[in-house]
Amino acid sequence: EVGPTVDIGTFSITLADPGQNRFLKAILKARVSASSVLEEVEGREPEIRDRVIDYLSSLTVKETQGAAAKSAIRGNLKKRINNILRTGELESIFLTEFVTQ
């Protein structure tokens, strides 16, 4: 059975490329293991957004390019968010929009 999905949010981030103003816009969704996790994710939105922003703003443009990079981003975000969840976990992260400029 497929678990419910939840919006993680829209993020506009300045990337960590020194001397360059490079930006990332990302819209994230997640599949959760149970509806109780859905409620926890919604209740912990500020903490989750903080972790996502911390991680994404540490990346360079190069670290956001290509399928392998996006897979690594999904895995790292899932791990960081799951570290604070108590009622279950995120099963998957979806990058529903992901644009660098």
PLM feature spans:
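Flexible, low-complexity charged segments
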Residues: 1-101
